[in-house]
Amino acid sequence: MRIITRGEAMRIHQQHPTSRLFPFCTGKYRWHGSTEAYTGREVQDIPGVLAVFAERRKDSFGPYVRLMSVTLN
């Protein structure tokens, strides 16, 4: 499975009324300019996960990336 853009993930989320947004993993990844740096990368294929997208967040240590997923579980 590949990381897609947030817009594509939201379209998938709207097409499946029972889906929800959930963190894909617990890790934080260093921010590299824009989400395009992460779009297209391969991630582990997990049953029930429809899509994975990168989301920019910020804490006291600075900006980071959180991988979020659209799931059916």
Q: Where are the predicted features?
A:
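Short intrinsically disordered terminal tails
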Residues: 1-2, 7-11, 70-73
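Acidic, low-complexity, intrinsically disordered interaction modules
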Residues: 16-72
